[in-house]
């Protein structure tokens, strides 16, 4: 009887324990939900005075009004900024998450100059499986330490070493474009993107992947497939939960692509580490450095050498994060800027003639490589690129997740709000850019830039978290454009409304950039 009683008592205890555990778990969930609702109600009340684009409904906000298609969504946001241009800021609720849209220089300055508001939007978490917590996605003390460590790697004296790679790949591109001379219009977006990918691979990793020669290579295909999957996931809230995402084919493809990209980068790092060790062993044995076909250094070599203030080197994982980040950030943005430049030059022949004259003054009829001194002389081309990035900023909008309450334009904005900065709209403020839809590189002549608000133009962001690679990007854009425009005259008959602007992380033309090429000098072979 005793054993029976003990057994029954044990079962009761187990049942009681299970019930208690369920009760505790349920209470915890309810408590979390209650805390979220209280926080949501506080934000709703605190941000009520901020002008809203339309009536927002509790919990769903404006989500029911937002367009699901990326092209239509971007056009909708831009339409709001145009409609409410007279207001200092506007508010949207995407579900329970509040967003404030910033498109006036004085308000953008408040966020971008803050040393506290440096956290990227929660959307950037979808980049973390690929990029880890590198310079783009990290926050707080890790970001500050990493930024300080890497900034010297982007000094002009170091970037000059990358110019040979840019020239070589630009010449391959020019040779590829030859077949289109005096032919029908073609979409130049993809070949230019492959050129930018070749440049970033060789400068970041010291690896020539030959994307321009073989655009169907596994690495190239995986890079583009991964980027597309990330963009799609950002727009699909039902894919935001990792376990749920992996239940679908796209989630499994995403995981497979990650493994492929990380394996490629890991192998390149291992090769570079082994090569450096072999060379150091030779030097240590008194045999001198190993013979090498090239003395070029890649960004990877710099990462293998840098140390923090305490003399600590980056780990293998740290290095992979930064190489992958440089790869991701460094080709799409520059490729977009070059394509938009060609479109605008092809649509504005009077501007193109001025560029041609400057190129002739610097290079004559020579086909020699572009030098750093040449780039310094190409001042009008520099203005063309700046004006291109004003009209079509490569990154049309970006966001900060506010880490504390702040005040903008007299309105109190709650902690946790997504502050969405919209360069596409900011750059069209008629106070600083009259006739904003007109393509006028002269806006950026020194005498015409005086008095302009320093935050009226932010193609590379601004403040402490501005783009660390902007000098590299401009150098690449000028070099490739100089090589193309020395050889070809560009014609474009596309109208703006035919482009199909899509504003994901990068501003892209859904319908491509279609141009015609003519040889500039008919007597050239």
Curated annotation (Swiss-Prot):
Keywords: Endoplasmic reticulum, Heme, Iron, Lipid metabolism, Membrane, Metal-binding, Monooxygenase, NADP, Oxidoreductase, Transmembrane, Transmembrane helix. GO terms for cellular component: endoplasmic reticulum membrane. Heme binds at residues 329, 467. It catalyses: dodecanoate + reduced [NADPH--hemoprotein reductase] + O2 = 12-hydroxydodecanoate + oxidized [NADPH--hemoprotein reductase] + H2O + H(+); tetradecanoate + reduced [NADPH--hemoprotein reductase] + O2 = 14-hydroxytetradecanoate + oxidized [NADPH--hemoprotein reductase] + H2O + H(+); hexadecanoate + reduced [NADPH--hemoprotein reductase] + O2 = 16-hydroxyhexadecanoate + oxidized [NADPH--hemoprotein reductase] + H2O + H(+); (5Z,8Z,11Z,14Z,17Z)-eicosapentaenoate + reduced [NADPH--hemoprotein reductase] + O2 = 20-hydroxy-(5Z,8Z,11Z,14Z,17Z)-eicosapentaenoate + oxidized [NADPH--hemoprotein reductase] + H2O + H(+). Its cofactor is heme. Inhibited by N-hydroxy-N'-(4-n-butyl-2-methylphenyl formamidine)(HET0016) with an IC(50) of 38 nM. It comes from the Eukaryota. The keyword Transit peptide does not apply. Pathway: Lipid metabolism; fatty acid metabolism. A cytochrome P450 monooxygenase involved in fatty acid metabolism in the eye. Catalyzes the omega-hydroxylation of polyunsaturated fatty acids (PUFAs) docosahexaenoate (DHA) and its precursor eicosapentaenoate (EPA), and may contribute to the homeostasis of these retinal PUFAs. Omega hydroxylates saturated fatty acids such as laurate, myristate and palmitate, the catalytic efficiency decreasing in the following order: myristate > laurate > palmitate (C14>C12>C16). Belongs to the cytochrome P450 family. This is Cytochrome P450 4V2. It comes from Rattus norvegicus.
